[in-house]
Design a protein with these regions (language model features):
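Secreted/periplasmic carbohydrate-active enzymes, especially glycoside hydrolases
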Residues: 1-94, 98-102, 140, 155-156, ...
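Substrate-binding/catalytic cleft of secreted carbohydrate-active enzymes
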Residues: 70, 79-207
Length: 207
């Protein structure tokens, strides 16, 4: 990481504000079905991570995050997926500084809406292709992107988890693609609806 300073000056040239920010440089490519990071093949050894503490439940603190980073590094884990929602903001700074790659997941999970007694039955799948859900879905994607777009550790955007597939999730994919920020986009439930497997996410080929 590199330390950058943005200076804001008044009309008379006097210094009004200084904003420090740690930045990094990265280039992600897929060449012959292999992911490269800054020109070198990327081998991912990653885990899903929930924000959880055995005593405080879903309310975790900075020390919990530091312990998780330490655990990842001790076990040679180089990447983490923020399942199944965006994490607290400090977590992304910690991943930046520790060199942990991040799949930043959008806050979307609705697996109960397309399963009936364990079977796949998507007649009431939400958000699916219902037009009344599109705005809310895109808003969640936008919130994820705009909040965390400047974090070098983020290599992937995730559209969510276990929410079947449909026009609305496809629209999320288009939203991230139009940003052209060089990151890859992933979604793990496209296989439930093969009509969208080529327009949402590629799960099965070996990149």
């Amino acid at each position: 990481m590199y330390h950058a300073y943005v200076e804001l000056k008044a009309e008379d040239g006097s210094l009004a504000e200084v904003i420090p920010y740690d930045i990094g440089f990265r280039r992600i490519e897929i060449i012959d079905k292999i992911i490269y990071l800054n020109g070198k093949r990327l081998i991912i050894t990653g885990v899903n991570r929930h924000e959880w503490n055995a005593k405080t439940g879903r309310c975790i603190g900075i020390e919990d995050m530091k312990a998780d980073i330490s655990c990842l590094l001790r076990n040679n884990i180089n990447s983490v997926r923020t399942c199944h929602y965006p994490d607290q903001i400090p977590w992304y700074y910690m991943c930046d500084n520790a060199g942990i790659y991040v799949m930043a997941e959008t806050n979307l999970e609705s697996h109960g809406s397309f399963q009936k007694l364990g079977a796949i039955e998507p007649s009431c799948n939400v958000p699916g292709s219902f037009p009344q859900w599109k705005g809310a879905v895109i808003d969640r994607a936008k919130n994820n992107f705009e909040t965390f777009k400047n974090h070098t550790s983020i290599l992937f955007w995730s559209l969510g988890n276990e929410s079947y597939a449909g026009d609305n999730i496809e629209a999320m994919n288009v939203y991230f693609a139009e940003k052209q920020d060089g990151r890859l986009v992933h979604y793990e439930s496209a296989y439930y609806n093969r009509a969208y497997e080529d327009t949402i996410s590629d799960l099965e080929t070996r990149m």
